[in-house]
A protein has these predicted regions:
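A bilobed periplasmic-binding-protein/Venus flytrap-type ligand-binding module shared by bacterial periplasmic
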Residues: 72-79, 121-123, 195-207, 226-229
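Extracellular/periplasmic juxtamembrane helices and adjacent flexible linkers that interface
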Residues: 208-209, 217-265
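Periplasmic-binding protein-like
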Residues: 54-58, 69, 135-140, 146, ...
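Ligand-binding "clamshell"
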Residues: 39-51, 58-61, 175-187
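Ligand-binding pocket segment of bilobal, Venus flytrap-like solute-binding proteins
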Residues: 105-186
Length: 265
């Protein structure tokens, strides 16, 4: 019999905890692609040459992507009754600017100091378009609330504590039964940013063979399109960049992890 001990924490905390205790974990799964890539680059990941995976979805046979998921804008549906539903970031900027009294203190997004995924999304948004900084300026003027993770944002969105959640993971909102009539989830049509969730096996894993089998199982589930068994968005078709801006699994991701760049960002 095989037992799985599953530790859940934020992406930035996960990176810190694993770096300090690499022998305490067999598999590391995270949506923060840049942090995962740096762990691999720094020698924390075991090479698994027996796993066959597309070049664009793995790095050095040590880091393996197994889902893709776009960042979304989630809205409290009732709050937008009578207002145009924003389809782009510019649309959102316009709605917020024209209705400041309604949205002051009612916008949520990631705290990039706490969230590795939030920092990844923010840096990639900033690289893609100057619209991101205009949106951040508007959100800041409306006293946006900062969060560690998508789950907390969605909780407050459902409760009406916030009315807009920016860069939230859409599957988290759509996967909850209590959101169906409460939330509207939008993939921005201007440049929806898509991340790949990835897994690695610790070089110090106590059960490396079982860890490798687990990663192989994750990949197989997604490759087979077993959505009913594994409800996260599949990896298949991740490189169709015509409709969305996919974040590539490549060394350039580590650029914004430089201490000086992070401080200035």
């Amino acid at each position: 019999n095989i037992a799985v001990q599953y530790l859940v924490t934020g992406t930035a905390d996960l990176d810190d905890v694993f770096r300090q205790n690499p022998d305490q974990f067999d598999v590391v799964i995270s949506s923060a692609m840049d942090l995962q890539l740096k762990l691999t680059n720094d020698g924390f990941a075991r090479q698994l040459p027996s796993i066959t995976h597309p070049d664009w979805a793995q790095w050095r046979s040590s880091l393996f992507a197994f889902t893709t998921e776009p960042a979304a804008i989630a809205l409290n549906t009732a709050a937008f009754d009578g207002l145009p539903t924003p389809r782009t970031r510019q649309d959102l900027i316009q709605v917020l600017r024209e209705n400041p009294d309604q949205f002051i203190g009612k916008i949520g997004t990631y705290d990039v100091r706490q969230s590795g995924l939030g920092y990844l999304f923010a840096t990639q948004d900033a690289r893609t378009s100057e619209t991101f900084w205009r949106l951040m300026e508007v959100m800041g003027s409306l006293d946006a609330k900062l969060y560690c993770c998508s789950g907390d944002m969605i909780d407050d969105l459902i409760a009406g504590q916030i009315l807009v959640a920016y860069n939230v993971l859409g599957s988290y909102a759509l996967g909850r039964a209590d959101t169906q009539d409460t939330l509207t989830v939008i993939l921005p049509s201007d440049f929806p940013t898509t991340m790949m969730r990835s897994a690695l096996v610790s070089k110090s894993a106590s059960s490396p063979d079982l860890a490798e089998a687990f990663v192989s199982h994750l990949i197989a589930l997604q490759s087979d399109g077993a959505g009913g068994v594994f409800p996260l968005p599949p990896l298949v078709g991740a490189q169709d960049t015509s409709a969305r801006a996919s974040i590539s699994l490549e060394p350039a991701l580590m650029t914004y992890l430089d201490t000086l760049k992070r401080q200035t960002f």
